[in-house]
């Protein structure tokens, strides 16, 4: 990975000190124009940080609804429930916007057993968008090392009809996580070309922790069956291979992929008092993977979106511009909900002044990713002055792929992502351990207050924070920030080049 990409990824995890509390405000605002903008931002932050509903909403999403895989009954329930929460808060124009996920995927049964040279049941998790094995697959295991094309090609004809064991380093940083993501596309291509019967991926997490990563985000199935294996079990297989023994495994993955399926984004507005046609959007993804309950990723930040909307209505606040609240689904499978939003609202993108996304759990907000737009730095710095007690803040210039800002970025809309301390986020990312207990409720309230102040400034300022970019300017941003390798790894590059992603009127 190039040094620029490494620096960008490491900066995501950089943390800054945040002070312990905000004093809750005691006086409401009858109308936003009755108070100076800075005062309104402080009162909004006070209201958010002192509200118990941020925690109770997070708890409901985790415990009453659970993992919210797009297309599942739980995700449909989450859509309905969050819609009702916006309506109860008194927001206008609360609506569901449907879109089609090109291929449904729901978890099915998966079993694996080591047959030789010793017998042992293997703990596995089915990998999203893996095809089934048809019938029970019994095959010899070969050492695929890191899963690189060279590692697989090194096996020659002996890889045909065999199952490859892909070894991994233990994940300790965001760089390690992205190494895992960046590996998959070329690994699958090489496995298909070699005639490999299947792949067993060693979990990067110790102590039996399993997780789900989508290794295909373009709506297609992987070319060979793939399963994630408990790290300790995969390490045992590796040692047996190292000893020279012939290792055989039985693998069965039940078909779980279907055809296109409808899902929904949840949208609500607080209309602007002077420029209602101009929009500042605050979003988070509502869907999650299913092994855990999607607490850090991303129930806590869905609750933050609702909390800001509720506080604004309780205080009677209406900014100069409309603030739109969006809970997207289909994010985990490839950003499908936010992609549909950009396409659906293509004629309005010129009037989208800014987009702010939260998607990194409840770790401390240390600033906001500028996503390659240096001109956003000044407006963001000014916006956070009312909550400077929570600083200092740093705003990385790096551009980020992999969350719901991205199709706005590709369409030239100014976009920001909350940069957060990932120390307690990474170990549970997409894992069975991502449950309510992982959430830092006190810090989540502060994070929401910080973002509320940012939103208020962006919606209240007389001037836009930055212009919308042209396609040529976005092309230059992609080149300058080194996004191309990530876009290729996530299966987005061809769609961008062909014009299927990136909306320009």
Regions inferred by a protein language model and the residue ranges of each:
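His/Asp/Glu-rich mid-to-C-terminal helical/loop segments that flank catalytic regions of hydrolases
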Residues: 226-229, 310, 426-491, 503-505
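N-terminal secretory signal peptides and thylakoid transit peptides that target proteins
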Residues: 2-16
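N-terminal hydrophobic or amphipathic helices/low-complexity stretches enriched
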Residues: 29-77, 84, 88-89, 154, ...
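Metal-dependent peptidase/peptidase-like ectodomains
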Residues: 117-121, 234, 275, 290, ...
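Extracellular/luminal Protease-associated
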Residues: 72, 123-225, 293, 391-394
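Soluble metallo-hydrolase cores and metallopeptidase-like ectodomains found primarily
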Residues: 38-40, 120-156, 216-295, 307-310, ...
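Noncatalytic luminal/extracellular "stalk/propeptide" segments of secretory-pathway proteins
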Residues: 37, 59, 63-163, 169-172
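Short helix-loop-beta-strand segments that form the rim/entrance of peptidase-like active sites
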Residues: 56, 221, 311-336
């Amino acid at each position: 990975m190039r040094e620029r990409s490494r620096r960008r990824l490491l900066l995501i995890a950089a943390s800054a000190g945040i002070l312990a509390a905000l004093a809750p405000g005691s006086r409401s605002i009858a109308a936003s124009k009755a108070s100076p903008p800075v005062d309104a931002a402080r009162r909004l932050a006070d209201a958010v940080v002192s509200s118990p509903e941020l925690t109770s909403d997070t708890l409901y999403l985790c415990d009453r609804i659970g993992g919210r895989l797009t297309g599942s009954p739980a995700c449909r329930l989450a859509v309905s429930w969050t819609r009702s929460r916006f309506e109860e808060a008194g927001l206008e124009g609360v609506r569901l916007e449907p879109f089609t996920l090109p291929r449904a995927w729901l978890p099915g049964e998966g079993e694996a057993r080591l047959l030789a040279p010793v017998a042992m049941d293997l703990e596995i998790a089915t990998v999203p968008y893996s095809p089934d094995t048809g019938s029970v697959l019994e095959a010899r295991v070969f050492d695929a090392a890191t899963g690189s094309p060279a590692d697989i090609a090194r096996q020659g004809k002996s890889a045909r009809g065999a199952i490859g064991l892909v070894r991994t380093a233990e994940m300790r940083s965001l760089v390690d996580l992205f190494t895992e993501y960046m590996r998959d596309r070329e690994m699958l291509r090489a496995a298909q070309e070699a005639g490999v019967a299947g792949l067993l991926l060693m979990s990067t997490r110790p102590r039996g922790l399993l997780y789900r990563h989508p290794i295909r985000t373009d709506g297609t199935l992987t070319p060979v069956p793939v399963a994630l294996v408990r790290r300790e079990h995969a390490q045992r297989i590796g040692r047996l291979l190292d000893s020279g023994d012939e290792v055989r495994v039985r693998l069965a993955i039940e078909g779980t992929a279907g055809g296109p399926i409808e899902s929904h984004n949840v949208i609500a507005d607080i209309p602007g008092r002077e420029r209602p046609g101009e929009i500042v959007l605050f979003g988070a993804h509502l869907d999650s993977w299913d092994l855990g309950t999607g607490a850090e990723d991303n129930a806590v930040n869905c609750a933050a979106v609702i909390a800001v909307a509720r506080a604004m209505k309780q205080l009677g606040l209406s900014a100069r511009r409309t603030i739109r609240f969006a809970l997207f689904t289909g994010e985990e499978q490839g950003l499908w909900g936010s992609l549909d939003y950009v396409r659906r609202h293509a004629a309005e993108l010129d009037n989208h002044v800014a987009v702010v996304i939260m998607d990194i759990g409840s770790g401390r907000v240390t600033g906001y990713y500028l996503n390659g737009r240096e001109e956003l730095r000044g407006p963001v710095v000014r916006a956070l002055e009312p909550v400077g007690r929570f600083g200092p803040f740093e705003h990385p210039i790096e551009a980020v792929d992999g969350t719901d800002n991205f199709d706005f970025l590709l369409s030239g809309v100014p976009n920001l992502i909350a940069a957060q301390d990932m120390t307690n986020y990474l170990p549970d990312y997409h894992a069975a351990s991502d449950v309510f207990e992982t959430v830092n409720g006190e810090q989540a309230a502060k994070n929401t207050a910080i973002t509320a102040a940012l939103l208020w400034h962006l919606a209240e300022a007389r001037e836009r924070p930055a212009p919308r970019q042209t396609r040529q300017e976005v092309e230059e941003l992609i080149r300058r920030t080194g996004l191309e390798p990530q876009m290729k790894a996530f299966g987005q590059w061809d769609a961008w080049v062909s014009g299927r992603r990136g909306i320009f009127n």
